[in-house]
Structure formats: structure tokens, C-alpha cells
């Protein structure tokens, strides 16, 4: 079994790349989905987050409103740090279990995580694949996808590790600034060598 860590900044197009990899046969573990799951009512991180940030982050049904929580933590570095301290260990534990439960030993598992490096998830993988995009495209994508203003989009981008730092951890870089066909070509080339190698190691 091989484990790839797929990362990139918000709006870099990680989801596009993980979608291509899923079609090629990879098992995708989406860290954002895991994060959402552990915040659900009755799940691992729910009580701790509500105790820390107050009931004002809840919607009418008592669920954590991620937009409300986001507006708090992305305006205050200390609060973001506190949220990460609560959630990151639980996300790592859950993903470790998901990898351990995979029965197909020839499978390539891809951990799709914006915070792969910051959380320490990169220590679980054999290779780190970094998706990069030019800053103007990144801002535009975040604004369109999340309905943010330019200022809000920049705030989210700047809250993450700078690209120059992420590059230091990357084994391979996928440039997603151009059209989808170019991105697919890069991903297929990486997949072919990685997938082939998994059978001969």
C-alpha cells in the first residue's frame, strides 16, 4: 500500500486533482470531510469547540455553524490556534484508523488535506504532492467558490502556511494555473510512476 499526501492552499484546485486521482483508482481520504464529521453534534470535537467558542457559533438546530466559527477564528490568530489544537489531533487519529482499515494492500491512498503539513499529517505519507496556482487565480477562485470579498479571500489565504514553506516539503508539484487538460496530464504522469512502483517494491 502507498499513501500520497495531496496538499495546496485554499483555492489551488486540490479537489480537482483528487477527483482525477479517484477516477484513476485511488482511495481518497478528504481531511475536510473528516474535520466536518468530528464537529457534528455528539462527535469527537463538538463539546470542546462549543465550550471554547460559546453557543453563539451554533445554528437553530444546535449544530456548529462553520461560517460563524470561521469568522471568529480567521480574525484572531490565537483563536485559530486554539481551534487547531482541538481538532488536529482528532483528525489525525481518525485518518490513521481509515488507513489501517484499508484491506487492499495494492491500493494507493490519497490524503487530500489543505493543512497536510501544518497538522503533521505529512508524516503518515510516502510522498507529498503539492498543487500550486498563481495568486490572482487563487483569490478569484476563493471569491467565486465561497462568496467572499477580495479582502476575506486574502485573509483565508494568508492564514495558511506560505507557498514557499510548503514547497520545502513537496516531493512533486502540480501546476494548476492552466487548463484542466494540462493538470490531468501532470497527474496521470505522477500516477503512472507511483502506481507502477507500488507493485514492484
UniProtKB/Swiss-Prot annotation:
It is an enzyme of class 2 (transferase). GO terms for biological process: coenzyme A biosynthetic process. Belongs to the CoaE family. Pfam families: CoaE. Keywords: ATP-binding, Coenzyme A biosynthesis, Cytoplasm, Kinase, Nucleotide-binding, Transferase. Residues 3-201 form the DPCK domain. It comes from the Bacteria. PROSITE patterns: DPCK. It is found in: Cytoplasm. InterPro entries: Depp_CoAkinase, P-loop_NTPase. Pathway: Cofactor biosynthesis; coenzyme A biosynthesis; CoA from (R)-pantothenate: step 5/5. It catalyses: 3'-dephospho-CoA + ATP = ADP + CoA + H(+). One of its GO terms (cellular component) is cytoplasm. The gene is coaE. ATP binds at residues 11-16. This is Dephospho-CoA kinase. Its EC number is 2.7.1.24. The keyword ATP-binding applies. One of its GO terms (molecular function) is dephospho-CoA kinase activity. Catalyzes the phosphorylation of the 3'-hydroxyl group of dephosphocoenzyme A to form coenzyme A.
